[in-house]
Amino acid sequence: MGNKVFKALTAVAAVAAAVWLLPKRKKEMAVRPIPAGESMSCIRERTGVNQDALCLYYYRPGRWTEKDAVFIAFHGFGRAGAEYCKALRKLAEERNMLIVCPELTERKYPGAEWYQEGGIMDTDGHIREKEERTFSAADRIVAEVKNRTQAAGKIILFGHSAGGQFVHRWALLGGKKNVDVIAVANS
């Protein structure tokens, strides 16, 4: 019986070693293409004061391909991502750019502390961990868009008003710099 147990354990060890030594394959992520026209998706986002999802509004011209530019626009303090996306449709068609407008809601990111200031400090003045700050949400938004679109064209990050303050601080205070152009207005 001891011989059978030894053989069984040897076989299990051999299989485990073989599996461990095999080349690792990247986990394939499901790419959910963004349809032409207006659309929306929501992602799980751990920053902010609750577990609410963070919604992204899109406008994709019919002739847009992954080789064309992506324009990610952060709204002002009015928190109107969907309206920004609608307002940028003409620009999208003229420049053949995919428009992405995240909506950082007041409920999830209350006040300037969580939006313009990026959630860097808590109410007691303590510095939050980098992954807890709103700026890390911007990095994940860019990553989500790149994954969904397989974008190879320029990635433009734009902020208007409060969004301009947010993007400006993101660029200065540790954003991943995984974009090609950063532009801010009226901040």
Question: Which role fits each region the language model picked out?
Answer:
Residues M1-A11:
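Membrane-penetrating hydrophobic segments
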Residues V12-V70, A82-E83, E94, T123-H126, ...:
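A domain-start/cap signature at the N-terminus of enzymes
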Residues R60-E66, K90, V145-Q150:
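Surface-exposed acidic, glycine-flexible loop patches that form ligand/cofactor-binding
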Residues W64-P110:
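Short substrate-entry loop that stabilizes the transition state in hydrolases
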Residues A87-L91, G118, G174-K176:
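Glycine-rich, phosphate-binding/catalytic loops in enzymes
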Residues L104-T105, Q150-L157:
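Surface-exposed patches in mature extracellular/periplasmic domains of secreted proteins
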Residues T105-E132:
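Cap/lid segment of the alpha/beta-hydrolase catalytic domain
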Residues F135-G153:
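Conserved acidic catalytic loop of the alpha/beta-hydrolase fold
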